[in-house]
């Protein structure tokens, strides 16, 4: 992470506890971190279409919530990187916790009867979210949020590995692709933090078009957005397979993956 550059922008002084490696107000005076902002589109638009498709397919509400939660994270991150205001930072970081809790619920309820509700798990995840929120609002320490978020992601990873190892081995491709994409994003996030000064110096010496490719926090958004979306597909595929539907991963326009399914034929 790096301190803000001495360039004044529309949103005024930075009040967030984090300021990332992208130089502030370089592309436009109306967006503090332009590339870190627009890269959130991958977390906003595709999940909206996923939720719409889910409503049409009459999916369980938990999966509609998962899609919409990812969209909320993207919108919050957009507002945070656009303004670098503390309130907008919370709008980014807290939904990361809430969305992951929804993902955890979906993953651990894949093998239950249709429309069942696990109130004990719901209460546990609600209590976790409430505790993290309360503590984070008081301590305002980003590392605390990162550890709490990491614990949820680690839980999802373990559950996913269990499913592709012991339950549906033929889903390894989708499960491990989701994990690999997410971990690659995490790697670039760390590179952006650790080598920020070197990256900034490099961007000063190369054409802007080339410099954009080193905005690794923006790549973190793209890769974790895609990884999270693929995780929802993996969870949804697992669930509908258990319910004896016939899910298939199809590529819309030959590019974007989506799960399409239909009820099993009755004889």
UniProtKB/Swiss-Prot annotation:
GO MF annotation terms = calcium ion binding; N-acylsphingosine amidohydrolase activity; zinc ion binding
**Localization in the cell:** Endoplasmic reticulum membrane; Golgi apparatus membrane
One BP annotation, GO: regulation of programmed cell death
Q: How does it sit in the membrane?
A: Multi-pass membrane protein
Which residues are noted in the entry as Ca(2+)-binding?
19-20, 22, 24, 33
UniProt cross-references to InterPro entries, sorted A to Z: ACER (IPR008901)
Topological domains on the Lumenal side lie at: 56-61, 109-118, 163-173, 237-267
Pfam (any one): Ceramidase
The domain of life is Eukaryota
EC nos: 3.5.1.-, 3.5.1.23
Q: Which cofactor does it need?
A: Zn(2+)
Cytoplasmic topology ranges: 1-33, 83-87, 140-141, 195-215
Give the family from UniProt: Belongs to the alkaline ceramidase family.
Its name, as the record gives it, is Alkaline ceramidase 3
Native organism taxonomy: Eukaryota, Metazoa, Chordata, Craniata, Vertebrata
């Amino acid at each position: 992470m790096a301190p803000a550059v001495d360039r004044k922008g529309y949103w005024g002084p930075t009040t967030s506890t984090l300021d990332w490696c992208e130089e502030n107000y370089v592309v436009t005076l109306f967006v503090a971190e332009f590339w870190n902002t627009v890269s959130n589109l991958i977390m906003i638009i595709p999940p909206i279409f996923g939720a719409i498709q889910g409503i049409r397919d009459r999916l369980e509400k938990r999966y509609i919530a998962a899609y919409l939660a990812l969209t909320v994270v993207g919108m919050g991150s957009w507002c945070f990187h656009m303004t670098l205001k503390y309130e907008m930072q919370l709008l980014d970081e807290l939904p990361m916790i809430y969305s992951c809790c929804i993902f955890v619920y979906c993953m651990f309820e894949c093998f239950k009867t249709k429309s069942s509700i696990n109130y004990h798990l719901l209460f546990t995840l609600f209590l976790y979210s409430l505790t993290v929120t309360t503590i984070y609002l008081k301590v305002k320490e980003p590392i605390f949020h990162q550890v709490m978020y990491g614990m949820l992601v680690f839980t999802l990873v373990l559950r996913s590995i269990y499913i592709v190892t012991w339950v549906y081995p033929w889903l390894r491709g989708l499960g491990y692709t989701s994990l690999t994409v997410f971990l690659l994003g995490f790697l670039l996030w760390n590179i952006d933090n650790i080598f920020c000064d070197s990256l900034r110096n490099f961007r000063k010496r190369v054409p802007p078009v080339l410099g954009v490719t080193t905005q690794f926090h923006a790549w973190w958004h793209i890769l974790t957005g895609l990884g999270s979306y693929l995780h929802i597909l993996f969870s949804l595929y697992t669930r509908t397979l258990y319910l004896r539907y016939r899910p298939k991963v199809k590529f819309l326009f030959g590019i974007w993956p989506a799960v399409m399914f239909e009820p099993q034929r009755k004889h």
